[in-house]
Amino acid sequence: MRIQSLLLLGVLLAVGSQLPAAFGRKKGEKSGRCPPDDGPCLLSVPDQCMEDSQCPFTRKCCYRACFRQCVPRISVKLGSCPEDQLQCLSPMNHLCHKDADCSGKKRCCPSACGRDCRDPARG
């Protein structure tokens, strides 16, 4: 009985260590995505983290203003943003900053003139 318990524990530990990779994440990487980095570059600021495991709670280690720091993660909707073939003549303000700013299944996507809410690409 004791050998079976140890064997079962070993199998569970082995499978559990592979779960992040099975879900497309590296070991220690937290769920969610980094918010867009729209800030100006602050070159003299040192990185505050190198990976998600160095950040408290649900925060993620993300590039913000050209250095890494722990920031609140954002959730991402299914689907990918469509490609934008246009060129912008006069940049406009962002109409969204994250997927949660968009209604329904729409995603906050980068475009030639800024971010806006769009239906995800098909295929």
From Swiss-Prot:
SS bonds (residue pairs): 34-62, 41-66, 49-61, 55-70, 81-109, 88-113, 96-108, 102-117
Gene3D superfamilies reported in the protein's UniProt record: Elafin-like (4.10.75.10)
WAP domain residues: 27-73, 74-121
GO biological process, any: innate immune response
Keywords assigned: Disulfide bond, Protease inhibitor, Repeat, Secreted, Serine protease inhibitor, Signal
An MF annotation (GO) of this entry: serine-type endopeptidase inhibitor activity
Annotated localization: Secreted
InterPro entries associated with the record: Elafin-like_sf, WAP_dom, WAP_four-disulfide_core
Transmembrane segments: none
Superkingdom of origin organism: Eukaryota
Record GO cellular component, one term: extracellular space
Signal sequence range: 1-24
KW Disulfide bond (keyword) present: yes
Functional description taken from the UniProt entry: Putative acid-stable proteinase inhibitor.
Stored PANTHER family: WAP FOUR-DISULFIDE CORE DOMAIN PROTEIN 5, WHEY ACDIC PROTEIN WAP
Protein name per Swiss-Prot or TrEMBL: WAP four-disulfide core domain protein 5
Organism: Callithrix jacchus
Taxonomic lineage: Eukaryota, Metazoa, Chordata, Craniata, Vertebrata
